[in-house]
Each structure stands twice: as C-alpha cells, then as structure tokens.
From Swiss-Prot:
Component of the large ribosomal subunit. The ribosome is a large ribonucleoprotein complex responsible for the synthesis of proteins in the cell. GO terms for biological process: translation. Keywords: Cytoplasm, Isopeptide bond, Phosphoprotein, Ribonucleoprotein, Ribosomal protein, Ubl conjugation. It comes from Ailuropoda melanoleuca. The gene is RPL26. Ufmylated by UFL1 in response to endoplasmic reticulum stress, promoting reticulophagy of endoplasmic reticulum sheets. It comes from the Eukaryota. The modification Phosphothreonine is found at T139. The lineage of its organism: Eukaryota, Metazoa, Chordata, Craniata, Vertebrata. SMART domains: KOW (SM00739). This is Large ribosomal subunit protein uL24. NCBIfam families: rplX_A_E.
Length: 145
C-alpha cells in the first residue's frame, strides 16, 4: 500500500507531468546539490541552479576537477550549459553540451537578497526538522563537523 494515496505512481502520468511541467515547477526540478563547504556554511543541501553559479561536473563524460560558470539554464530541455563544457561539431564550430543539474555540484552561489532569503528559510526549516528528530544522530554529527 502506498503511503500517500492521493499521489499517483502511474508511469505514464508521471512522464506526462514531467514533460508538460510549467516553468516555475521546472525551476525546482533543475536543482543541484551544494558542495560540502557550502553545505557546512549555509546548512542547506541543494538549491535550484541559476545562471552565473559556479559548478563542477561530478558524473558522466565531462566529470573532472575543472570548475565552470553556468552560461544558461535551459528549462525546456531540463539542462544547463557550463562555460568550459563544449564539443566541436562536424563543421568546426564549438557548441555547449547540455548537462543535467543533478550531475553537478554547486561550488559558488550567485547571491542576491532573494536568494539569501531562500537560503535562510531552507536552513531554518532544516533546523526545525533536526529539533523534531527528523535526522539520525550520525547525520547530525556529520553536519556539525
């Protein structure tokens, strides 16, 4: 039995919702985890990605130590384009390669007042969850280290 009966687990319905999702919902889907340093600093695990964030690819063909700036967030295709992640086309021109945000970690955030508010709000709700005992003891110890 499913835990929440009002949410469907039908594959075709979920695919339909994914591909027909409006832009404001796609924004949330296009979230990336924060690096360990940022996670310690802000007490937030992930954030919706935006242009001018600095990211590092951690999965796939382009993974490596190089850190690049997000050039474009293409919500329609569910991909982001990163500064140094390019390939050459047959005619010789270089194009950016689309990468899904779940395959990168954010190493530097572009902060403005709205984004700072989001970080504070997320950290606050995480703190409330910790007080309720939502996270295991090991997780709490790791977060404090």
């Amino acid at each position: 039995m499913k835990s929440y009966p009002f949410v469907t687990s039908d594959r075709s319905k979920n695919r339909k919702r994914h591909f027909n999702a409006p832009s404001h919902i796609r924004r949330k889907t296009l979230s990336s985890p924060l690096s360990k340093e940022l996670r310690q600093k802000y007490n937030v695990r992930s954030m919706p990605i935006r242009k001018d964030d600095e990211v590092q690819v951690v999965r796939g063909h382009y993974k490596g130590q190089q850190i690049g700036k997000v050039v474009q967030v293409y919500r329609k295709k569910y991909v982001i384009y990163i500064e140094r992640v390019q390939r050459e086309k047959a005619n010789g021109t270089t194009v950016h390669v689309g990468i899904h945000p779940s395959k990168v970690v954010i190493t530097r955030l572009k902060l403005d007042k709205d984004r700072k508010k989001i970080l504070e709000r997320k950290a606050k709700s995480r703190q409330v969850g910790k007080e309720k005992g939502k996270y295991k003891e090991e997780t709490n110890e790791k977060m404090q280290e």
